[in-house]
Amino acid sequence: MLKAIMLEDETLHQSHVIFSLYQGPMEDHPIFRSIHLSIISDQHPHIILLSPTVGECNYGGRVTDDKDRRLLLSLLSTFYSWELIEQDCYHLCEGDVYYVPAHGPYQSYVNYIRSLPICADPCVFGLHSNADITKDNQETNQLLEGILLTLPRQSGGGAKSPQEVVEELSEDILSKLRADFDIQVVMDKYPVMYEESMNTVLRQEVIRFNRLTEVVRDSLVNICKALKGQIVMSSELENVFNSMLVGKVPAMWAAKSYPSLKPLGSYVTDLLSRLQVLQNWIDDGPPSVFWLSGFYFTQSFLTGVSQNFARKHTIPIDYIGFEFEVTKEETHMEEKPKDGAYVRGLFLEGARWDRQNMVIGESLPKILFDSLPIIKLKPGEMDKFQHENIYLCPVYKTSARRGTLSTTGHSTNYVLSIELPSDKPQKHWINRGVACLCQLDD
């Protein structure tokens, strides 16, 4: 049953990787047998030991992402609990449909199973009903993308040819794309300083975006030349042409780009916004509120904030962590904080921000995302932090929530985890798959 729930969670896109779970009987696992013997040797069974036994020993090596392991252990705690043993008709979720039937004859279990709905409600997996909408949207998008790829490339009547469409689109993007940043001007105005790590962050961001815009500009110029017969249409340019024709970001761009799942039009708009934010920073100095989603490499900004605090207060940076304060302001702050930074641009998926009670709350029906107000990053010594009545919410760059597993044990799509005030136990939001996203897909 646990395997079925985990695979369904993956289908509903609340887990990060497709699970390749151990298919043999759990009892055959040597570590499980060893711990099982130590459990049954006691007169009172240790239910609490079963969760880590199965979660860490049986599945631990196969579920490599630590956020997936957290979800796995949370789901296990639903099944390995004294309430399930002691209560008759133990309910697995809200409502009267899904529960563990009371002890009875074999046929009573069969009758209960036959009474269950054919299509399971997301609540049985701990998810909000909106999870079905997310799944259906993604399946529909995949279907439409496949249909687009099968359409003929010839146009009839007075419609524009594919070549004309791509050429006009290329010229439009080129007209909007700004010139590369002058690295030397940035270095002269914001030199490397021990007291201000943000200067280094800015310079690194400018260099990264220059590389990206150079690839975008060169590919668009060459596409226009190839369509006019001035140069040969290489396989790389053909890939750019085909991607632009169906509204996708070309692989050549994605290889040099920050992670993004946006279609081509939204991607270009987003890129131009990021470039403008950097230009404003260069012209007017560091903003009072940083657009967290606008950084090419978000971790460098977080490291810069930590370094500034560590150097100012002469504390080893290894001892530094962040506390988080969700403010009531949505877009603007009058002054910069003395320590830390204000950030904006995060979207909450799987829950919403209750602005009245200043805690995370249940999503409203058919509203999949909720923008978070400005958040204050407050660096400090980690051993002095108090972690009470919070949900440790992971932040991802895109809604895919998956990437390459890095040496830290986190996905490359993962940014950090922020503590959000909550009036419910963490388990509730873990099962909901609640996370923050730096950008949406549209």
Predicted regions: what they are:
Residues A4-M6, Q14-D442:
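Long C-terminal appendages of very large multidomain proteins
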